[in-house]
């Protein structure tokens, strides 16, 4: 165990630099705003800075922990259930995995509290069942080789059909649920499952089908919550603003974070427990991994646990009040339109601080053998989130229905999926679920809510929906990146024979024969 810990120290330094590169731009933007056009109280600013420090350390531990534990666990489990070749076993275990992982996702508790007219347990069990069911569909797609775009047309068609019958006060929360439930706990494990299942197939389409699980799992919660909205007629969703901190000294500042730590220690322990138990069962029944591999996974799980506790504490206690207050101040200006470009700027950088984005970018680079670099993926995601936050702020200022953005957006995204390489489509729809993580829920959503309060809008219909918007735009930007790559490849293939012909044309006949 000591050897594993020592070996991980250089990696921790590398991850610390990555975390600083992700969080420092956001902190710098907020500081510039605070010292210029959006003054905030010292209490809020100090909480934000301490929260940023905790997020940096949290990302450092989580990203290394996910590499060491969640990814190998998911890949091994995915491979072993596929090796059984028994469809009922594969589908049954797939449903159970999806259900158990989702039911313990911390962000799902937050979603349940936003919809008071539906009993919390009913909502949580329904959403978990939705994820489990669509993980089964995802496994079937991979094993049978069903086209992802065709399934997306079918299921998103069902979603928008149901949306016509859901109360408008409930619509945005329902679409937010798809992004909320694919959080930092579920994404690394589910993505690794996909790689493990596709690796057993070993055919030429295996890499294309290794992505798409998160995309399918994001559909289940939306359908489940829309159906519940029709059944319960949930039109009385309420908004409880975050309490703005007031501290007079450093001890009170630490107390704010210290009081919340036990909550997140318990939440993350409960979240990790089902994954650990399921992996333990597989280890005793089928995996039989050696001690060193198990030790590495144990250290990785410890890093993951510490990282997520620090990250969520920093985000919820430090970032959420700052986001809400900044939104109020910016939208309260005489030039309230400033919230749109400021939101876009923050959105561009904030996605880089999403824990699961690191896992996605690294896995994309590995599966594509570097054809899609982590940097290119990061740029495509940042551009997508920037656009989505800008559109979300337009909604806050104008009160336009979210469907005016989601319907054309998804129609375009699914439409181009039929001409874009399959791998890019699967990655793009996975990226939507990954980008809309806890940083969106704890900073961008409060930013929109604060702005909505300042302009006197309807919080439930106008501010909620930011998560859904953030989940939608990467579907377009990542696929457009794939389309550009495809066109460049075709152009290079056309130019290659012409270039060779031109080179030979300039040589004498004797030289050509010698060649």
Identify what each model region corresponds to.
Residues 1-19, 23, 74-88, 203-213, ...:
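Intrinsically disordered, low-complexity non-transmembrane regions of multi-pass membrane transporters
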Residues 243-356:
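Transmembrane helical segments that form the transport core of multi-pass membrane transport proteins
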Residues 13-19, 40-50, 82, 115-124, ...:
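Interfacial loop-to-helix junctions that mark the boundaries of transmembrane helices
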Residues 14-22, 46-52, 80-88, 148-153, ...:
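Alpha-helical transmembrane segments and their helix-start/interface "positive-inside/aromatic belt" motifs
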Residues 2, 138-153, 168-169, 201-247, ...:
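Juxtamembrane and boundary regions of transmembrane helices in multi-pass small-molecule transporters
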Residues 24-37, 51-61, 93-100, 130-141, ...:
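Hydrophobic core segments of alpha-helical transmembrane domains in multi-pass membrane transport
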Residues 32-46, 66-74, 100-115, 134-146, ...:
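Transmembrane helix-loop junctions in multi-pass membrane proteins
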Residues 78-79, 87-158, 336-417:
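Helix-loop-helix junctions within the multi-pass membrane cores of secondary transporters/permeases
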